[in-house]
């Protein structure tokens, strides 16, 4: 695995009700948990992401891909990939997917966020994905 070139990215933990968000600085040194987006229509979600991306000068997106224990796609992973690709195209940003298997469980344990309905758990999971991406990659792909 190749460590990606550091840049300001958003990491997304895409769920049916909320999208957890974490971001990093352009050097990839600090990771910030951001407020989760409570999902609505794609158009409303997009407006929120446009503002976040503008404010943070985002250069790419990392999306969690919830593969099963064997690394195979699931119904949820297919939905996440479709959403991530559509969002990246609309925002004109490169995109990378990272296996998010057990990221929510890890976030629950690491940040003591059991039974959270506020979105903090989702954003904590996004932060774990971002930390994993900063170490392992893959590089962002702008061919979306």
Swiss-Prot record:
Q: Name one Pfam family in it.
A: RuvX
Q: What class of enzyme is it?
A: hydrolase
NCBIfam families from the entry? RNAse_H_YqgF
Which EC numbers does the record give? 3.1.-.-
| Family annotation (HAMAP family) | Nuclease_YqgF
What Gene3D superfamilies would the database entry show? YqgF/RNase H-like domain
Q: Which cysteines are joined by disulfide bonds?
A: none
What InterPro entries does this protein map onto? RNaseH-like_sf, YqgF, YqgF/RNaseH-like_dom, YqgF/RNaseH-like_dom_sf
Physiological role: Could be a nuclease involved in processing of the 5'-end of pre-16S rRNA.
GO biological process terms held by the UniProt record: rRNA 5'-end processing
What this protein is called in its record is: Putative pre-16S rRNA nuclease
Q: Which family does it belong to?
A: Belongs to the YqgF nuclease family.
Q: Which residues form the signal peptide?
A: none
Cellular component terms (Gene Ontology): cytosol
Query: Where would you say this protein principally sits, based on its record?
Result: cytoplasm
The organism named in the record is: Prochlorococcus marinus (strain NATL1A)
Keywords on record:
Cytoplasm, Hydrolase, Nuclease, Ribosome biogenesis
Q: Which GO terms describe its molecular function?
A: nuclease activity
The compartments listed are:
Cytoplasm
């Amino acid at each position: 695995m190749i460590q990606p070139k550091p840049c300001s990215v958003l990491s997304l933990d895409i769920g049916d009700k909320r999208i957890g968000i974490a971001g990093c600085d352009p050097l990839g040194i600090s990771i910030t948990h951001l407020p989760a987006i409570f999902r609505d229509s794609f158009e409303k979600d997009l407006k929120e992401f446009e503002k976040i991306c503008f404010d943070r000068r985002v250069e790419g997106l990392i999306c969690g891909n919830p593969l099963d224990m064997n690394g195979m796609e699931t119904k949820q992973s297919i939905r996440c990939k479709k959403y991530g690709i559509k969002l990246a195209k609309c925002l004109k940003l490169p995109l990378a997917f990272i296996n998010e298997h057990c990221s929510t469980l890890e976030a629950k344990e690491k940040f003591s966020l059991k039974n959270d309905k506020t979105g903090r758990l989702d954003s904590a999971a996004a932060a774990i994905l971002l930390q994993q991406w900063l170490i392992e990659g893959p590089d962002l792909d702008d061919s979306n």
